[in-house]
Amino acid sequence: MSVAAGGPAGAAIPESRLMALGILGGLAGIYASAVNPVIGPVLASLGAVCAIVWGADAIRRVASYGLGTGVPSIGYMSVSIGIVGVVAGLASVFVVPAIAVPVVALILAMILGVVVAVLGKKIVKMKIPILEKCTAEISGAAALSVLGFSAAIAGSYTLQTMLTSVITTGFIGLLFILNTMAIQHPFNACLGPNENQTRTLKLAASTGFISMAIVGLLGIGLNPSWWLVSLIGALCWIVAFRAFVSASFEEAASVKWSGLWPKEEEH
């Protein structure tokens, strides 16, 4: 059972593989952002989607220890931690090589996530055995997804381009909301006794890709490939969302599009 204070249901995909997908895919996309002005932002966005899927799985694992009411809370908290890690990572360019900035942002976000989780267990008395691990994962996923989408908008992950294209414009605030919803919504929508990882992650892919389509629009006037980012994001969203809906139909006892459910004696 996925939401009965007993932890998540069985996983079809090991968490280690999803972590590898999020970290390696996210970092690869960020580093590729400046390779080419056309394909770079697309790769950065795809890397961000990889991180979102990783974060959604971590949300699924930690939020299964309860009724699911804390899903939005840990989502917003962890993405805010991730953004702090991103900003600190960008500022670290004054003490570390520029190529290390994404890794520093990831590490700082995950460390801060662990600190906040420890405070939650010690002060708030949250009795979740995997709180530290999952909060660190969600914060790291948030950092990579925000940095990936920011690089897609700005065209690179350098401090100056981020300040000019993402922070000064206020897009960083929009990315906070956008990435939070993309990471926390999948489990929030699928939680329940019959929740399973595969269906939840299909929805996570769809929220990641629709976010990618929106990020492309934010790049209008900032990078020449904004339309390609939006187009690929929208097409992939259609594929992912259809897969999610199909999985929901297959696993549902029955489907009713409108009106009230029939009474038992009317079946």
Curated annotation (Swiss-Prot):
Chain coiled-coil ranges: none
Pathway, per record: One-carbon metabolism; methanogenesis from CO(2); methyl-coenzyme M from 5,10-methylene-5,6,7,8-tetrahydromethanopterin: step 2/2
Signals that turn on the gene: Part of the probable mtrEDCBAFGH operon.
Entry keywords, A to Z: Cell membrane, Membrane, Methanogenesis, Methyltransferase, One-carbon metabolism, Transferase, Translocase, Transmembrane, Transmembrane helix
GO MF terms held by the record: tetrahydromethanopterin S-methyltransferase activity
Subcellular location: Cell membrane
One biological process term in Gene Ontology: one-carbon metabolic process
Topological relation to the membrane, as annotated: Multi-pass membrane protein
Transmembrane segments: 18-38, 39-59, 76-96, 99-119, 138-158, 163-183, 209-229, 230-250
Keyword Isomerase included in the entry's annotation: no
Catalytic activity: 5-methyl-5,6,7,8-tetrahydromethanopterin + coenzyme M + 2 Na(+)(in) = 5,6,7,8-tetrahydromethanopterin + methyl-coenzyme M + 2 Na(+)(out)
Enzyme class (EC, first level): translocase
GO cellular component terms attached to this protein's record: methyltransferase complex; plasma membrane
EC number(s) per entry: 7.2.1.4
Subunit structure: The complex is composed of 8 subunits; MtrA, MtrB, MtrC, MtrD, MtrE, MtrF, MtrG and MtrH.
Purpose of the protein: Part of a complex that catalyzes the formation of methyl-coenzyme M and tetrahydromethanopterin from coenzyme M and methyl-tetrahydromethanopterin. This is an energy-conserving, sodium-ion translocating step.
Family: Belongs to the MtrC family.
Protein name in UniProt: Tetrahydromethanopterin S-methyltransferase subunit C
Organism this protein belongs to: Methanothermobacter marburgensis (strain ATCC BAA-927 / DSM 2133 / JCM 14651 / NBRC 100331 / OCM 82 / Marburg) (Methanobacterium thermoautotrophicum)
Protein's gene: mtrC
